[in-house]
Amino acid sequence: MLALAAAPLLVCSAATADDALPDANRILDRLEALELRQKALERELAERDARIRELERRARGREATAGRQLEELPVSPNEEPGTTGATRSAYALNAGPRTPPAVDSGSEPSSYGVFQPGGQGFKLVDTPQGDLNFSAWAYVRYLNQQDLDDSYVDAFGRERTIDQRNDFQLNKINLYFKGWLFDPAFRYNFYTWTSNANQGDPASVVIAGNLSYQFSPELDVGMGIGGLPGTRSLRGTFPFWNKVDNRTIADEFFRPSYTSGLWAAGTFENNLNYRVMIGNNLSQVGINADQLDDELNTISGALWWTPQGEYGPAGGYGDFEHHEEPVTTFGVHFTHSREDRQTQPGTEAIENAQLRLSDGTLLFQPGAFATDGQVNRATYRMMAVDGGYKHRGWSLEGEYYWRAMDNFSTVGDVPVNDLFDHGFQLQLGSMLLPRKLQAYAAGSKIFGEYGNPWDLAVGLNWYPNERRLFRVNTEMLYLNDSPVGYASVPFALGGNGMVLHTNVELMF
């Protein structure tokens, strides 16, 4: 009886087990499908992470490229303002492929007519085929040189008159039209550049530009008018200087200048940056093509490292940004050029990177050494090393220069076969009021074969709206036998004594 009673139960249990098997199989199938899908998602996430890392790497390179090309508002025709590869900051104007989107806090984004902060200017056009941006830089200067001696005597006993000045000048104006076309990696930069203190002189107004293409963060190639990167001030740091559009006399004395040529620049993931350029001569401003030789042997290069990954906008001077942690920069530069007296600009040329003796005498002028001889050709070689430190509004920055000139081609009696000079500059800055008021001191000295000139300046920068690109500057400058000087800078050739100048500088 019990067996008969249990039989139906066993039959039901067996049937239930048979029914459960398909369900278990379906669950296993679903688990396997979910496992496969999870693996696919993991692969997709890994690929996406790899793409993000690559985009971040490219973005770092683009910000680096921007500094080499787009934030340096040049003292003479060169490239426009940008952030150096070391900075990777928000100040980059056309950071690589495309100009950053316009910013307008008070309205919806627009494709044109919008002001872009940080020196980017106004976005005039923004289309899938390219964009166009307009920016400008200018400053007004009051200059008083009445405390200078009215004459000086050079190393050969020749007395020369100094034209003391006391005037106002709208000293320089730069107008920029820049952007990209067809391919975001292909960029153009066209500009007009004026030096109103030199009105009437050759090349007081220049219309020029350059073209560039970024193949990768490590390789950006350009051609046109550019600065030979022979010193830090020609490495894309302008206008982020303590001074307003003038260097120490040592930097001015040793440096190369601006010329037409071809360059390559790049930045690497270890925060190492480079720029190398081959050009026509040391300074092409005011020089026509017929005056150039056919050797094309002017070459200049710079290699610099920012261990912390950035050194402020454009890698410039001073710590306006108030770095909470210390940042540093280290660089080395070299320039070589075979110069002809016809390829050197005139004495009062706007950017007269002249080859001079340390008493200010032009190397190529007739009778330079108080003889009947003249140097017609010479080889210029210059090396510079620089370093900088910034922390909490303080900055200390220096540079040392070595320059050799030899292999002279002469006519008549020239008593020397070569020249060697060296020197240094130091700049100390402190933000007395964060983003409002900066004090600085800058000095330099040249150890030369025909004199040891030096200069010392102290100045104040006031930023009325707490923006670095608009400031009022006042500087007291003491000169001792200045070997350099021309109309657009505050120092006078041969100057001895005190100079006062006040500047109002604006860049947008």
Question: What annotation goes with each model-predicted range?
Answer:
Residues 119-284, 291-311, 317-340, 420, ...:
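Outer membrane beta-barrel
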Residues 26-29, 298, 499:
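N-terminal amphipathic/basic helix or basic patch
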Residues 107, 323-508:
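Outer-membrane beta-barrel pore domains
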Residues 15-139, 146-149, 271, 305, ...:
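N-terminal periplasmic/intermembrane-space "pro-region" immediately following the signal or transit peptide
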Residues 22-25, 165, 378:
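Residues at secondary-structure transition points
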Residues 115, 255-256, 378-379:
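A short catalytic or substrate-binding loop motif that flags glycine-/basic-rich loops and adjacent residues
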Residues 2-11:
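Bacterial N-terminal signal peptides
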